[in-house]
């Protein structure tokens, strides 16, 4: 296993550049089965192993430690996994709003909400976003047994109309399509954003956090690309009365149909702490996945070679050695 580490330069407490040695790690790892099929008639069996390139770093923010892991897969899938660990915030136990994690010690209910700024360029910069979901159909002459359902597709054409919530009950996803590039079936090439669909911000609309972190009230925002728009809550969150960032930017309601666009995806955890999270919390996970949809004409991993046949053996006395033939 080969690993590479990269330094990162960040802003220090006083705004000066500060270099963190070996801040980012990159390595490749096995990830189980890529694809497999056993043909009972021909007696053939084919299996290919999945590998992924991992780009990761950890950051400590107060009492919590967060790991951010980008996974790049052989089939074109891109995944982000956020890992939350560290020490939960505690106070005197309050039964209605916290979990007692030690005698008289409570860990309040809370959320970890992140915003991923996804500057998309799906086979070019002229992209658009379609909201795609399952649509149930009533029994009819076309659906006499009530078994079929359809795929609904709606173009999100303006910034204000693209502030959306996930809906796992409909398998809702967002397809980022290229309007100028088509696959062999004549369809626009695309990548799909698959959300986990966890709750967005639960704080009341009158709260200061709701005003300052309005980005966290939606799973999806889409804006025209602007290099000055980097932070979803604006530049000065703690000093702002609210409304900065995405709510202000999308108020212009610009067209995002066939433009250079940025997707902002809110994802995270709603954490009801457990006694097992104390005194240090085992990692909990959140994230999202981007998958090619018609971006390739077929499975792009058909040329992955089979693994060498072999078996792993081991024990307290060292590796297994087969008996010698005398």
Residue map of PLM features:
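Extended effector regions of multi-domain proteins
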Residues: 1-77, 83, 90-96, 101-326
């Amino acid at each position: 296993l080969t690993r590479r580490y990269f330094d990162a330069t960040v802003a220090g407490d006083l705004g000066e550049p500060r270099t963190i040695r070996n801040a980012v790690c990159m390595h490749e790892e096995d990830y189980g089965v890529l694809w497999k099929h056993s043909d009972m008639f021909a007696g053939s069996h084919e299996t290919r192993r999945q590998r992924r390139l991992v780009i990761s770093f950890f950051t400590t923010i107060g009492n919590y430690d967060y790991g951010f892991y980008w996974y790049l897969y052989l089939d074109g899938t891109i995944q982000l996994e956020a890992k939350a660990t560290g020490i939960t915030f505690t106070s005197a136990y309050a039964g209605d709003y916290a979990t007692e994690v030690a005698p008289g010690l409570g860990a309040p209910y809370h959320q970890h909400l992140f915003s991923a700024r996804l500057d998309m360029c799906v086979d070019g910069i002229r992209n658009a976003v379609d909201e795609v979901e399952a649509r149930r159909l009533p029994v009819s002459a076309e659906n006499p047994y009530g078994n079929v359902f359809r795929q609904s597709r709606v173009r999100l054409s303006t910034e204000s109309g693209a502030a959306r919530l996930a809906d796992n009950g409909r398998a809702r996803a967002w397809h980022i399509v290229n309007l100028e590039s088509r696959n062999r079936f004549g369809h626009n090439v695309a990548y799909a954003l698959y959300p986990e669909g966890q709750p967005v911000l639960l704080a009341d609309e009158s709260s200061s956090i709701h005003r300052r972190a309005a980005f966290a009230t939606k799973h999806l925002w889409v804006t025209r690309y602007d290099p000055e728009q980097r932070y979803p809550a604006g530049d000065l969150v703690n000093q702002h009365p609210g409304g900065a960032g995405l709510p202000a930017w999308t108020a212009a309601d610009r067209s995002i149909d066939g433009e250079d666009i940025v997707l902002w995806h809110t994802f995270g955890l709603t954490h009801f702490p457990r006694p097992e999270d104390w005194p240090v919390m085992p990692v909990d996970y959140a994230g999202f996945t981007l998958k090619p949809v018609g971006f390739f004409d077929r499975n792009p991993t058909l040329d992955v070679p089979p693994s060498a046949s072999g078996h792993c053996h081991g024990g307290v006395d060292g590796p297994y050695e087969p008996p010698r033939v005398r």
